[in-house]
């Protein structure tokens, strides 16, 4: 046992500085005597690497952190390594607690870290030739092989360390350092920006690069909790973590080319990752730069997406949200190009459609978009024709989109103020070429709510044929009160 003396002294020292540590004799026992096991030699032969893994050095490594391993941890380690011949333990080289000088507070270790530190130090001394990466791999494999009982002491120690850490650093907040070159975008993930989700601001930047004529602020991007019923007033800035990626950051990483380039060609953004709720009206109005056919590849094969969940692929092709009161703001994002260009010239302050209906916006839970901001010229055109919204839809291939929202249910469009039992939008025949026919956009000053102009009992008859050619005919003007 004289070989073990230095080792004993070490454990005793550590026990003294360890808060509430049990008496040194206990630690000596646990450190010095391997648990008697009949299969000692077997274990050594079958698991030579494992046997060497944890025990003596845990303490040393621990030493560099200010916490020492309590007896239970050492016992657990020696339990895992039982059968190991302790006379082989060399006198470990003491490392001065270097971290004491550093102000940087480390995170409390989790259970695996507790185990790995305890084991690694010992093994590193034991097998100096072992490469650290190999060591880590082996430790990880070993940890996965441990059963709950063997892991428990490490888990408990980790919990103790966490509580202790909380006491020592009550205002500690984990702040990972931002590394410059991490494998594609891991640093962003650490910083809380979802990598799977392209920032709407980045999309907007890409779209804006070529179209100077859409002028309005970035803060139009809307996030879920924002509709708080104000009927006029500036739009609130985005609050969700999703949008706080700096707008200039090339967030379109997955396309593999910088933003400046992607602005030049019609930008190829991966529409599967875009949440339509966060596209601002500028983005939607600039969307004419896209080739409509580019959307086709993202259309679901049978045209039956869930109304709210699969909007992302269309990035602004439809402004329909699946919450009951979303429709007032939802409008035809697909306008003919002439109308969009007309709309994009600098205009007097535009009223965004979705902020006007203050009563119903109380109940909006999901993300909404401020859809096409119709310019005053549009409003005045449509004040005379009291029929819903005749836009020139013929310039888009609507056959791609006409079948994509068949699942809208009657309950979603009931508006308490204007109907008792009539549903605002009932897909009586399950066709939805009537999608746009129900929204009449009047001047906000004269119409506080969006009511159907034709009597709502007429609405069920609106859905016409599925074939897109009929969009050109002014079929909507025939809707008058019976």
UniProtKB/Swiss-Prot annotation:
Biological process according to GO: cartilage development; chondrocyte differentiation; gonadal mesoderm development; growth plate cartilage chondrocyte growth; inner ear development; negative regulation of canonical Wnt signaling pathway; negative regulation of fatty acid oxidation; negative regulation of osteoblast differentiation
Biased composition regions of type Polar residues, renumbered to the chain: 42-52, 211-220, 308-326, 351-366, 458-482
Cross-link Glycyl lysine isopeptide (Lys-Gly) (interchain with G-Cter in SUMO): residue positions: 61, 370
Database matches in PROSITE patterns: HMG_BOX_2 (PS50118)
Annotated motif 9aaTAD 2, positions: 291-299
UniProt GO molecular function: DNA binding; sequence-specific DNA binding; transcription corepressor activity; ubiquitin-like protein ligase binding
UniProt subcellular location: Nucleus; Cytoplasm
SMART domains the record matches: HMG (SM00398)
Keyword match Cytoplasm: yes
Tissues in which the UniProt entry reports expression: Expressed in both male and female gonads from after metamorphosis through to adult stages. In the testis, expression is restricted to the supporting Sertoli-like cells. Conversely in the ovary, expression is localized to primary oocytes (at protein level). In developing limbs, expressed before chrondrocytes form (stage 52 tadpoles) and throughout the cartilaginous anlagen until stage 56, after which expression ceases in the enlarged cells of the diaphysis.
Composition bias type Low complexity, residue spans: 30-41, 375-390
Compositionally biased spans, kind Basic and acidic residues: 56-66, 160-174
Transactivation domain (TAC): region residues: 366-482
InterPro entries, alphabetized: HMG_box_dom (IPR009071), HMG_box_dom_sf (IPR036910), Sox_N (IPR022151), SOX_TF (IPR050917)
Pfam families: HMG_box, Sox_N
Region (Transactivation domain (TAM)), start-end ranges: 224-308
Stretch list, region Dimerization (DIM): 63-103
Ranges spanned by the short sequence motif 9aaTAD 3, renumbered to the chain: 433-441
Motif range (9aaTAD 1): 276-285
One annotated Gene Ontology cellular component of this protein: nucleus
Task of the protein: Transcription factor that plays a key role in chondrocytes differentiation and skeletal development. Specifically binds the 5'-ACAAAG-3' DNA motif present in enhancers and super-enhancers and promotes expression of genes important for chondrogenesis, including COL2A1. Plays a central role in successive steps of chondrocyte differentiation. Absolutely required for precartilaginous condensation, the first step in chondrogenesis during which skeletal progenitors differentiate into prechondrocytes.
Comment text on domains: The 9aaTAD motif is a transactivation domain present in a large number of yeast and animal transcription factors.
PANTHER family, A to Z: SOX100B (PTHR45803), TRANSCRIPTION FACTOR SOX-9 (PTHR45803:SF1)
Summary of subunit composition and partner proteins: Interacts with the sumoylation factors ube2i/ubc9 and sumo1.
UniProt-recorded name of the protein: Transcription factor Sox-9
High-level lineage: Eukaryota, Metazoa, Chordata, Craniata, Vertebrata
């Amino acid at each position: 046992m004289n070989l073990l003396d230095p080792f004993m002294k070490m454990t005793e020292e550590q026990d003294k500085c360890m808060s509430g540590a049990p008496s040194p004799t206990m630690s000596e026992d646990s450190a010095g005597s391997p648990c008697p096991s009949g299969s000692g030699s077997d274990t050594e032969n079958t698991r030579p690497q494992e046997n060497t893994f944890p025990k003596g050095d845990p303490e040393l490594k621990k030493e560099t952190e200010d916490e020492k391993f309590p007896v239970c941890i050492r016992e657990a380690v020696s339990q895992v390594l039982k059968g190991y011949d302790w006379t082989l333990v060399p006198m470990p080289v003491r490392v001065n607690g270097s971290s004491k000088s550093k102000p940087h507070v480390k995170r409390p270790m989790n259970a695996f870290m507790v185990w790995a530190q305890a084991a690694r130090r010992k093994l590193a001394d034991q097998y100096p030739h072992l490469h650290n990466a190999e060591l880590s791999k082996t430790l990880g494999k070993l940890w996965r092989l441990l059963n709950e009982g063997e892991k428990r002491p490490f888990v408990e120690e980790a919990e103790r360390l966490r509580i202790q850490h909380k006491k020592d650093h009550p205002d500690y907040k984990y702040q990972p350092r931002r590394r410059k070159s991490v494998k594609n975008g891991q640093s962003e993930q650490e910083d809380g920006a979802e990598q799977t989700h392209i920032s709407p601001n980045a999309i907007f930047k890409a779209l804006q690069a070529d179209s100077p004529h859409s002028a309005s602020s970035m803060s139009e991007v809307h996030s879920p909790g924002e509709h708080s019923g104000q009927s006029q007033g500036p739009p609130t800035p985005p609050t969700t973590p999703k949008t706080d990626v700096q707008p200039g950051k090339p967030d379109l990483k997955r396309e593999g080319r910088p933003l400046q380039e992607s602005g030049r060609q019609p930008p190829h953004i991966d529409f599967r990752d875009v949440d339509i709720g966060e596209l601002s009206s500028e983005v939607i109005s600039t969307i004419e730069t896209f080739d409509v056919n580019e959307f086709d590849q993202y259309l679901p094969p049978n045209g039956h997406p869930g109304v709210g969940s699969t909007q992302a692929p269309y990035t602004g092709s439809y402004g329909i949200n699946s919450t009951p009161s979303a429709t007032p703001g939802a409008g035809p994002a697909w306008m003919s190009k002439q109308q969009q260009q007309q709309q994009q010239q600098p205009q007097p302050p535009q009223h965004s459609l979705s902020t006007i209906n203050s009563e119903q916006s109380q109940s909006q839970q999901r993300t909404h978009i401020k859809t096409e901001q119709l310019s005053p010229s549009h409003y005045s055109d449509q004040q005379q024709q009291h029929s819903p919204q005749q836009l020139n839809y013929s310039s888009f291939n609507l056959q791609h989109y006409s079948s994509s929202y068949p699942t809208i249910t009657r309950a979603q469009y009931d508006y308490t103020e204007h109907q008792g039992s009539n549903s605002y939008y009932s897909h009586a025949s399950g066709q939805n070429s009537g999608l746009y026919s129900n929204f009449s956009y009047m001047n906000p000053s004269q119409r506080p709510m969006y009511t159907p102009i034709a009597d709502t009992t007429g609405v069920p008859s609106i859905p016409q044929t599925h074939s897109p050619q009929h969009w050109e005919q002014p079929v909507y003007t025939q809707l008058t009160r019976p």
